[in-house]
Amino acid sequence: MSRGLGDVYKRQTVEENLAIGAYSSKDKEKLKKNIEMVYDIFPRLGERREQLARTMSGGEQQMLAIGRALTLSPRLLLIDEVSMGLMPIMVNTCFKVIHDLNKNGITVLVVEQNANKALKVANRGYVLETGKIVLSDTAENLRGNNVVQNAYLGA
């Protein structure tokens, strides 16, 4: 996870990683509720509360990194290359979570090379080339754009 959401603390357990994520929170009851919410979103993490992060798969570490960010009840979540190096089932899980978070009122900004998956969960999309925005539109319009289809969606 050298590029993703941030490294997890590999020598810490899942539970410790989540608690560290909300270290600045003074409301311990809210922290407990938020950690339980993370376990509801990612049941696999709940099953592995005492497991060291270093023994988890890349997808599980990605879930843990997202979960750690969620312990602070963010209004905005920035995610970079959520699908990089993950098994297809984990990619689907991560994008479903992103979609659900957005439906629950969290703004999620995703930087992602998997344009097909990203545009399926996005409200809006931007195409960058050499660091410059070359296309900007609703996700639906971008999915229907011939240039986007040919260059990024494999049409």
Predicted feature descriptions by range:
Residues V91-N104:
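Helical segment within the ABC ATPase nucleotide-binding domain
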Residues L52-M56, E60:
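Conserved ABC ATPase signature
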Residues S73:
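Conserved catalytic motifs of ABC-family nucleotide-binding domains
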Residues M1-Y9:
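Single conserved hydrophobic/aromatic residue that forms the stacking wall/gate
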Residues R124, S136:
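Short, glycine/charged-rich "phosphate-handling" switch motifs in NTP-dependent
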Residues R11-A19:
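Short coil-to-helix segment of the ABC ATPase nucleotide-binding domain corresponding to the Q-loop/switch region
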Residues A69-L70:
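ABC ATPase C-loop
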